[in-house]
Amino acid sequence: MINTIIFDFGNIFINLNDTYTLDYIKHFESSEHYKSIIKTNIQFEKGEISIDSFLKSYQSYFPDLSKEEIKSKWNSILGEFPKYRLDFLKDLKENSNYKLILLSNTNELHISWIKDNIAFYKDFKSCFNEFYLSHEIKLRKPDVDVFNFVLNKNNLTAEACLFIDDNKDNIISADYLNINTWHLNPKTDDVIDLFKN
């Protein structure tokens, strides 16, 4: 029986901007440094490099961009956080016995932006029994290690957990460990419909 729900953050609660992907590709994917950029991004999301090191890396690839321009492009993926999703989460916390866990690939810049721009961030965070951000725990999906970390840290069995994420690679890793999954499609699904599935 499922007693724990593990949620992703982006495209589950906060919307991510499709236009960001186009902008990112336009500015970065065409670069000869693309593989190095992806490595830098992963290091940043795992908390292995500082904000300053991250920005300096990007400036070495794109010297025409200022640090503020890089920050702006980096944060432009973050969109609206509809309050009805917070209401759903609050109701779930108050009226169910599920253990609620957040497991997000993120970074210092994104979390800083969210804290500054999402007025109810503290309320959101308080809904969870555990709140795991990749740059803080030094682990990142889809690595199997991050799922084992969550299971072991909370004395959970895979079969008792439901993991909700919009990224197929992350779902595959969770499936590999026999964690129940919902591969949420942000274009057609909404987390508030969890119990309608």
Q: Model segments located where?
A:
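Generic enzyme active-site microenvironment
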Residues: 6, 103, 163-164
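Generic structural signal for small/hydrophobic residues in well-ordered secondary structure
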Residues: 8-11, 47, 92, 102, ...
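Substrate-recognition element of Asp-dependent hydrolases with the DxDx(T/V) motif
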Residues: 69-117
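Short, solvent-exposed loop/turn segments at secondary-structure junctions
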Residues: 12-13, 18-20, 106-110, 137-139, ...
